[in-house]
Amino acid sequence: MHVPGTFYVNDALKGLLFEELQQAVVRGDHGGFLPAVKQLANVAALPGIVKRSIALPDVHSGYGFAIGNVAAFDMDNPEAVVSPGGVGFDINCGVRLLRTNLTEAEVGPVREQLAQALFDHIPVGVGSQGIIPTTAKDMESALELGMDWSLREGYAWAEDKEHCEEYGRMLNADPRYVSSRAKKRGLPQMGTLGAGNHYAEVQVVDEVYDAVAARRMGIDTPGQVVVMIHSGSRGLGHQVATDALVAMERAMARDGIITNDRQLACARINSEEGQAYLKAMSCAANYAWVNRSSMTFLARQAFAKIFKSTPDDLDMHVVYDVSHNIAKVEQHCVDGQHRRLLVHRKGSTRAFPPHHPLIPADYQLIGQPVLVGGTMGTSSYVLTGTEQGFTETFGSTCHGAGRARSRNNSRNKLDYQDVLDNLKAKGIAIRVASPKLVMEEAPESYKDVSEVVDTCHQAGISKKAVKLRPIAVIKG
């Protein structure tokens, strides 16, 4: 290990980490499974890593890097690497939050109709195909321009991109580095939710912890209705990652790079393979922002239909849009010196502090909004970034609850009807394309998101602003 590993966990979450470690001892590394503790140590041994390998409270085993792992690499160190495993297969999987001027009293009586309207408007599920008309030429433009393409084509409002990480566009994107297979997979999926833990939720403001921050974001009234969309780059992002892993295995053999785990395939940042991946990854990130923008357009249409109004009159503005699977070049202070770092965030969210130049003007006094999605039927949170987090975790915090059970375990141990009945008992309308996903994504499959968020708050790496409660959910 070149640097130490640091875990941000409380006693309850620490117990889950040790359970995962114990499972690994019993079953071995069958199927490539490694516990998060070991994965964090393996990342700490990668060339060019600085400061520490960081595990956030929602950490659990992933591919190469654990999900919930943050690691930064010195751009000026010729040995430093970029690893697709540090971003994940769903590049720029992220969350967008829309506010409305509706209340729970207005939406509650029609939540079933609203859930159905969202389900009808937004294509969901494995293999779902979008209804946004997209040609091969459009795809090239979307990969390069990100949300600027959405704005040009009429699927976004001008102010949407102002409230988006990177303003919805990675400038170093170059579609020439995205394979034809990746483009072919992405073309029919524009504006689709996908499956797994992706969702669109209608939520209400449940508690306000920071009135100033909540007011600045326009979500300061308990009972106010908001919409959360969680999705990523679909098959295109998966193919970009797959293509890069193959190329990087060759680069490792050529350059003599040795890692502790084959899943940590990587390349020197400034190598041909490293730069090709970063350009293709940026295209996939742009695709994901276009995807969430397209679903925002569709969600606005669904609300307008149900409430016989316009999205503008319903005040359906974007509060913020964050990525939690990405690698970006950022300026940070390491050992008292300002350094250019390639920060890998996998299952973790950027959380920049007040006055940082890369956050919108209207959030300068409160810090960057951080959107933390809960599980199906549990609360979600809006946090803000802190100066302490910028110093300790490269301006990063948690992204969600984090799995506590494997998908297979959830399918075997949970009953479909029981999960649905529990959601209905909480007054939540649900539409799901695949029944098995109800078990896989049930609250029992995940850690307690409140424990995760509270741990980050108590550690000072982010600050709680608003708690959100679901009243309608659509899933793939």
UniProtKB/Swiss-Prot annotation:
It catalyses: a 3'-end 3'-phospho-ribonucleotide-RNA + a 5'-end dephospho-ribonucleoside-RNA + GTP = a ribonucleotidyl-ribonucleotide-RNA + GMP + diphosphate; a 3'-end 2',3'-cyclophospho-ribonucleotide-RNA + a 5'-end dephospho-ribonucleoside-RNA + GTP + H2O = a ribonucleotidyl-ribonucleotide-RNA + GMP + diphosphate + H(+). The keyword Cell membrane does not apply. This is RNA-splicing ligase RtcB homolog. It comes from the Eukaryota. Binds 2 manganese ions per subunit. GO terms for molecular function: GTP binding; metal ion binding; RNA ligase (GTP) activity. GO terms for biological process: tRNA splicing, via endonucleolytic cleavage and ligation. One of its GO terms (cellular component) is tRNA-splicing ligase complex. Catalytic component of the tRNA-splicing ligase complex. PANTHER family: RNA-SPLICING LIGASE RTCB HOMOLOG. InterPro entries: RtcB (IPR001233), RtcB-like_sf (IPR036025), RtcB_euk (IPR027513). It holds the Pfam family RtcB. Mn(2+) 2 binds at C93, H230, H324. It comes from Chlamydomonas reinhardtii. Signal peptide: none annotated. Mn(2+) 1 binds at D90, C93, H198. Ligation probably proceeds through 3 nucleotidyl transfer steps, with 2',3'-cyclic phosphate termini being hydrolyzed to 3'-P termini in a step that precedes 3'-P activation with GMP. In the first nucleotidyl transfer step, RTCB reacts with GTP to form a covalent RTCB-histidine-GMP intermediate with release of PPi; in the second step, the GMP moiety is transferred to the RNA 3'-P; in the third step, the 5'-OH from the opposite RNA strand attacks the activated 3'-P to form a 3',5'-phosphodiester bond and release GMP. Its cofactor is Mn(2+). Catalytic subunit of the tRNA-splicing ligase complex that acts by directly joining spliced tRNA halves to mature-sized tRNAs by incorporating the precursor-derived splice junction phosphate into the mature tRNA as a canonical 3',5'-phosphodiester. May act as an RNA ligase with broad substrate specificity, and may function toward other RNAs. GMP binds at residues 197-201, 324-325, 373-376, 380, 399-402, 475.
